[in-house]
């Protein structure tokens, strides 16, 4: 929790702390960078560094105040080359009006004004200082402030505001971006208070594997198609529930009814076959006799 000497706005709610712990935002890596030592709470027996959740919350509120101080929301550029943060930065940009760069950062975006992708933001926010090193380096050339989500092993060179958190887990990254967007909207007046429930759930900021989602959709479609085929087959075959209760001769013994129906069908088929056979024999015999009688006559005429 935040120290008591700080303003009340820095005090998080119990639900916020529970969400940070559930998303494992407090779990760092086994390596520790010297500038991240002030944000360390303790070292676990297995060598994992545990971050101070209270300081994480303080930096989220501080970063939100910096973002809200910029008049034009489009002058804020949010960047994530890490796949787990690309969905989060896109959602953050859509909710706050910022400019998102999800995926590979093209070198020269902040320094080469000839390129079409040239941008002049007043503030950039990166998901990982290590994977987004090119963006931080170019921001240092043109004096752009940098806010970064930093793990215990993240380099903090040219980072102005470091938010200590786990920047490698999909849930931790999504939750921090969601809380940052919520605080920005609260400071802008879109949300009345922090206790006001935001209609955007945090799940929208979590990374989703496209292949897993596609396989899930295919499996759901196959299940629905199989159920439809089974239902259609039952209707076409006539084996509905009410047909079994129909009162008919032999209804109590389905085998007897089936045998009687089969015998009747076989007798009808045999009668039809004999009749057709007799007609076929009669029609084929006459042409054979006529051909035999006519053939020798033709031969005698030629000789």
UniProtKB/Swiss-Prot annotation:
InterPro entries: Ribosomal_uS2 (IPR001865), Ribosomal_uS2_C (IPR032281), Ribosomal_uS2_CS (IPR018130), Ribosomal_uS2_euk (IPR027498), Ribosomal_uS2_euk/arc (IPR005707), Ribosomal_uS2_flav_dom_sf (IPR023591). One of its GO terms (biological process) is translation. Keywords: Cytoplasm, Ribonucleoprotein, Ribosomal protein. Residues 269-303 are annotated as: Disordered. It is found in: Cytoplasm. GO terms for cellular component: cytosolic small ribosomal subunit. Pfam families: 40S_SA_C, Ribosomal_S2. One of its GO terms (molecular function) is structural constituent of ribosome. Residues 269-286 have a biased composition (Low complexity). Component of the small ribosomal subunit. Mature ribosomes consist of a small (40S) and a large (60S) subunit. The 40S subunit contains about 33 different proteins and 1 molecule of RNA (18S). The 60S subunit contains about 49 different proteins and 3 molecules of RNA (25S, 5.8S and 5S). Interacts with rps21. Required for the assembly and/or stability of the 40S ribosomal subunit. Required for the processing of the 20S rRNA-precursor to mature 18S rRNA in a late step of the maturation of 40S ribosomal subunits. Belongs to the universal ribosomal protein uS2 family. This is Small ribosomal subunit protein uS2. It comes from Penicillium rubens (strain ATCC 28089 / DSM 1075 / NRRL 1951 / Wisconsin 54-1255).
């Amino acid at each position: 929790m935040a120290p008591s000497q700080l303003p009340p706005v820095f005090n998080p709610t119990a639900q916020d702390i529970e969400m940070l712990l559930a998303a494992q935002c407090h779990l760092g890596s086994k390596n520790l960078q010297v500038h991240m030592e002030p944000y360390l709470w303790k070292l676990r027996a297995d060598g994992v560094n545990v971050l101070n959740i209270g300081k994480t919350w303080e930096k989220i509120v501080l970063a939100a105040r910096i973002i809200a101080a910029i008049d034009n929301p489009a002058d804020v550029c949010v960047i994530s080359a890490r796949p787990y943060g690309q969905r989060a930065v896109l959602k953050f940009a859509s909710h706050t009006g910022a400019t998102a760069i999800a995926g590979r950062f093209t070198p020269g975006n902040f320094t080469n004004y000839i390129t079409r992708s040239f941008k002049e933001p007043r503030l950039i926010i990166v998901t990982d200082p290590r994977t987004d090193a090119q963006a931080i380096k170019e921001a240092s050339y043109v004096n752009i402030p940098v806010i970064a989500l930093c793990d215990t092993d993240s380099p903090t060179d040219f980072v102005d505001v470091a938010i200590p958190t786990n920047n490698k887990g999909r849930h931790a990254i999504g939750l921090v971006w969601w809380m940052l967007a919520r605080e920005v909207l609260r400071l802008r007046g879109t949300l009345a208070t922090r206790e006001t429930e935001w209609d955007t759930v945090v799940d929208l900021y979590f990374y989703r594997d496209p292949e897993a989602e596609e396989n899930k959709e295919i499996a759901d479609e196959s299940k629905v198609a199989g159920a439809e085929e089974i239902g259609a087959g039952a209707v076409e075959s006539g084996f509905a529930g009410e047909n079994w209760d129909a009162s008919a001769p032999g209804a109590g013994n389905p085998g007897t009814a089936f045998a009687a129906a089969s015998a009747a069908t076989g007798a009808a088929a045999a009668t039809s076959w004999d009749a057709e056979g007799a007609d076929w024999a009669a029609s084929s015999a006459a042409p054979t006799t006529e051909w035999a009688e006519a053939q020798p006559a033709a031969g005698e005429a030629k000789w």
